[in-house]
């Protein structure tokens, strides 16, 4: 089974990806892990990626696409299938993935899209606060400190509501064309992500069992 998982930051995509891998035994292919492995193994694309990263530059699409292709060509993929997580990030990468899969004789079986209302995600992501003295992390709503005093806590710039909203807007602008592309191919299953983790996975599992 060859899968792609999508969802906005904070939607719980990583949690569900781990559960899918555990339950279905597919190879988990996350962008970060792929880059680290390619650089550690000094593959052709890994060396290229490292040359950009060492200079503090963005890795071009053709290198990222090349690293994905190297990983998808490995033996375990044909045997176990895969779950792509964090790629493609742009419609151009989605088209490159289509070409790679065709070249390798593989096909995508389904796209799981974890949907959560953006306003809920802003609350989830912007509630994180850090204790100035201990460095402990809490959440204003989901894990509040017992003795909360505003002056004892601070919030990282990345966690402020306006920053979170901007990040979500960018992700939505990039993600929508990708989802639309896969919807036209009748590959997308939308999963309601604003429920308990176990309930989300029950819906994911049901959708995947129907694909088998």
Curated annotation (Swiss-Prot):
Keywords: ATP-binding, Cytoplasm, Kinase, Nucleotide biosynthesis, Nucleotide-binding, Transferase. Residues 127-159 are annotated as: LID. GO terms for molecular function: adenylate kinase activity; ATP binding. ATP binds at residues 10-15, 128, 137-138, 195. InterPro entries: Adenyl_kin_sub, Adenylat/UMP-CMP_kin, Adenylat_kinase_CS, P-loop_NTPase. It comes from the Bacteria. AMP binds at residues 31, 36, 57-59, 86-89, 93, 156, 167. One of its GO terms (cellular component) is cytoplasm. It is found in: Cytoplasm. Catalyzes the reversible transfer of the terminal phosphate group between ATP and AMP. Plays an important role in cellular energy homeostasis and in adenine nucleotide metabolism. NCBIfam families: adk (TIGR01351), PRK00279.1-2 (NF001380), PRK00279.1-3 (NF001381), PRK00279.1-4 (NF001382). HAMAP family: Adenylate_kinase_Adk (MF_00235). Monomer. Consists of three domains, a large central CORE domain and two small peripheral domains, NMPbind and LID, which undergo movements during catalysis. The LID domain closes over the site of phosphoryl transfer upon ATP binding. Assembling and dissambling the active center during each catalytic cycle provides an effective means to prevent ATP hydrolysis. Belongs to the adenylate kinase family. This is Adenylate kinase. The gene is adk.
């Amino acid at each position: 089974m060859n899968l792609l998982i999508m969802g906005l930051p904070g939607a719980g995509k990583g949690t569900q990806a781990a559960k899918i891998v555990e339950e279905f035994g597919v190879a988990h292919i996350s962008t970060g892990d792929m880059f680290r492995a390619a650089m550690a193994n000094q593959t052709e694309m890994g060396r290229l990626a490292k040359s950009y990263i060492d200079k503090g530059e963005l890795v071009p699409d053709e290198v990222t696409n090349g690293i994905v292709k190297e990983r998808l060509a490995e033996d375990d993929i044909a045997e176990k299938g895969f779950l792509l997580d964090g790629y493609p990030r742009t419609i151009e990468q989605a088209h490159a993935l289509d070409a790679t899969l065709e070249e390798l004789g593989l096909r995508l079986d389904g796209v799981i899209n974890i949907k959560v209302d953006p306003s809920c995600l802003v609350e989830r992501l912007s509630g994180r606060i850090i204790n100035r003295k201990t460095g402990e992390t809490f959440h204003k709503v989901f894990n509040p400190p017992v003795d909360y005093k505003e002056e004892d806590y601070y919030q990282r710039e990345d966690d402020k509501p306006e920053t979170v909203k901007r990040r979500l807007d960018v992700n939505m602008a990039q993600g929508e064309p990708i989802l639309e592309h896969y919807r036209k191919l009748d590959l997308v299953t939308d999963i309601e992500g604003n429920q308990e983790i176990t309930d989300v996975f029950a819906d994911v599992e049901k959708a995947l069992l129907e694909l088998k």
